[in-house]
């Protein structure tokens, strides 16, 4: 067993050692927290809350304030859900410390900012800045909070890894479809219908055809053409002239018929 004098000498040293360890741990925690944005008490004593916009958008907000050494300003993060179920996320950022009255009346500043936020019909789509009446005018220049533009989603890579190759592929598909829907290779083109004739043209053509067919029908088969009408003159001579006047009569008949 240790004597009573030794116990009395060890107790103060143990207390000092424990207190030193506690102080070192507290300093470490404070240093780690200085690099991360910490919640700031809002007008109702909390760092977050909920509200309903005039167009029935259910929104929740969270207020974050960076460390004094950080260059980024304060951020008011929002998450809203529209009546049709669509969800939106956005944030308002600014530097309220540029207002001279912010350090002394910080809670009043955020109360006025949140009041202006609740009046917006669509908080995540209204680009109007949020400004407290406490810091209106030149004394609060740069202290307003502005809507952060939302980043567009990255383009989806194609199979080959290049987004520009998707359009030519779509064009080639359209051409193959046109070829498939067109006439098959090797098939003759459809014959065009003959042009329609007018009734007057039909009658003229039919008359010409009949005139061309009549001489062929009246001419007996096996007989050739009758050049200069000599056969007809001979028949007239034999019919109307006697044998002794046959040559003279034939001469006059040929002369008359010319």
UniProtKB/Swiss-Prot annotation:
Compositionally biased intervals (Basic and acidic residues): 198-209
Query: Where is this gene product found?
Result: Secreted
Question: Which BP terms does GO give this entry?
Answer: cell-cell signaling; positive regulation of fibroblast growth factor receptor signaling pathway; positive regulation of vascular permeability
One of its Pfam families is FGF-BP1
Record's signal peptide: 1-26
Disulfide pairs? Answer: 59-80, 90-124, 241-249
Cellular component (GO) terms are:
collagen-containing extracellular matrix; extracellular region
Q: Name one GO molecular function term.
A: heparin binding
Q: Which InterPro entries match?
A: FGF1-bd (IPR010510)
Q: Where is the composition biased (Pro residues)?
A: 186-197
Sequence segments annotated as region (Disordered): 146-231
Which superkingdom? Eukaryota
- Describe the function of this protein: Heparin-binding protein which binds to FGF2, prevents binding of FGF2 to heparin and probably inhibits immobilization of FGF2 on extracellular matrix glycosaminoglycans, allowing its release and subsequent activation of FGFR signaling which leads to increased vascular permeability.
* Entry's family note: Belongs to the fibroblast growth factor-binding protein family.
Assembly, per entry: Interacts with FGF2.
The name of this protein is: Fibroblast growth factor-binding protein 3
What species is given as this protein's source?
Homo sapiens
State the organism's lineage: Eukaryota, Metazoa, Chordata, Craniata, Vertebrata
């Amino acid at each position: 067993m240790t004597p009573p004098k030794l116990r009395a000498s060890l107790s103060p040293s143990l207390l000092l050692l424990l207190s030193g360890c506690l102080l070192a741990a507290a300093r470490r925690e404070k240093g780690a927290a200085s690099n991360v944005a910490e919640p700031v008490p809002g007008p109702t004593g909390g760092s977050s809350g909920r509200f309903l916009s005039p167009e029935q958008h259910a929104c929740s907000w969270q207020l974050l304030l960076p460390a004094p050494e950080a260059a980024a300003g304060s951020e008011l993060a929002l998450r809203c859900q529209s009546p049709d179920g669509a969800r939106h996320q956005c944030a308002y950022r600014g530097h309220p410390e540029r207002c001279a009255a912010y350090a002394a009346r910080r809670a009043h500043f955020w109360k006025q900012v949140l009041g202006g936020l609740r009046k917006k019909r669509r908080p995540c789509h209204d680009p109007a800045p949020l400004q407290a009446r406490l810091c209106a005018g030149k004394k609060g220049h740069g202290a307003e909070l502005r809507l952060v533009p939302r980043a567009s989603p990255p383009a989806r890579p194609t199979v080959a890894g290049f987004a520009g190759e998707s359009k030519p592929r779509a064009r080639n598909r359209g051409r193959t479809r046109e070829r498939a829907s067109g006439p098959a290779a090797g098939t003759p083109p459809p014959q065009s219908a003959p042009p329609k004739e007018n009734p007057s043209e039909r009658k003229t053509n039919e008359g010409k055809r009949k005139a061309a067919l009549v001489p062929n029908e009246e001419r007996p088969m096996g007989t050739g053409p009758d050049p200069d009408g000599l056969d007809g003159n001979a028949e007239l001579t034999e019919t109307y002239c006697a044998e002794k006047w046959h040559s003279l009569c034939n001469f006059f008949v040929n002369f008359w018929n010319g």
